[in-house]
Amino acid sequence: MSSRGPLDERETLARDLVTASYLKGDFVLRSGKHSNRYFDKFLFETDPELLRRLGKYLSTLVPLTTQRLAAPELGAVLLGGAVSMETGLPLVLVRKEPKGYGT
């Protein structure tokens, strides 16, 4: 508990995200560097209850005048989808590069 009293939802959510995704060990990062700590976002993104709670919290930060949400491919598709479902706003997926087939 914080000195302000019981944890509010934001603090509880932050604690639960860290509990689910913060890892200690020996990790090789994308840069090739080594780290003894790693935050694996896929661990919270694949937890339906945690993803739902995060989508609900983030939806409170979306301005009322927003017409569409956007999420970069792969990195934020699940999170963008969770916010989209909570707000009812359509989600646009942003590709790094155009693909040569389909839509």
Features from the language model and the residues they span:
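Gly/Ser/Thr-rich beta-alpha loop segments that engage phosphate groups in nucleotides
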Residues: F27, H34, E73, V77-L78, ...
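Conserved hydrophobic/aromatic pocket- or pore-lining residues that grip, position, or stack substrates
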Residues: G32, L69, L91
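Fold-independent oxyanion-binding glycine-rich loops
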Residues: K41-F42, P72-L74, R95-E97
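A glycine-rich, hydrophobic loop/mini-helix early in the fold
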Residues: R53-L61, L74, L79-A82, T87
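Short glycine-rich phosphate-binding loop at a beta-alpha junction
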Residues: T65-E73
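Short, glycine/charge-rich flexible loops or terminal/linker lids adjacent to PRPP-binding catalytic cores
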Residues: G81-T103
